[in-house]
Amino acid sequence: MIRFARATCVAAAMLVAPLANAADKDAGDVDTFARYAGTWKMQLNYVESAHSKARVESMTVANDCWRSDFFYVCNQIIDGKSRALIVFFYDPVAKRYGSYPIAVGADTVHPATVVVDEKSITFPYDMQDNGKTVHMRIVNTFTTPETLDFKQEYSEDGQKWVTMATGVEHRVSPKAK
């Protein structure tokens, strides 16, 4: 699921009042991430590409999640081991979604933009490859409330996308086990 996932919710004193007013209207937008809660069985198929090796991966991903105001937080447990704490947020002033994925053992936390629509959640990010920026994205398309299609892609120009991996996830429990 969200394995590579990677802005900010810092308000200056002058923004506190507008933010509070926006909270009444827009705080519910963070609920879009509630669809990740629960335990999922995942099957991924990677292809040989410039940024991936051909392989098949299977895993169980349990997302133990909760909501607090503008934040939706998930402890992501992969095959029984806690691997990351992902803090999703909605900024009603900027009208944008983002996340702070905190991986176990990581020295830094990198804020990430998250693109949300009715059927999908996309996690775009960039990486460096020999001094060249490569655009990456993970796209989760919810085909039913209990199933999502996974796709990981890269692009050297931000226009033409090459698929690195595809897969499917099935929710097996509404709660993390």
Feature map (PLM): residue ranges:
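Repetitive helical segments and hydrophobic/amphipathic motifs
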Residues: 12-15
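Bacterial N-terminal signal peptides that target proteins for export
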Residues: 1-9
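N-terminal signal peptide c-region/cleavage motif recognized by signal peptidases
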Residues: 17-19
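Hydrophobic small-molecule pocket/channel-lining residues, especially in calycin-type beta-barrels
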Residues: 22-177
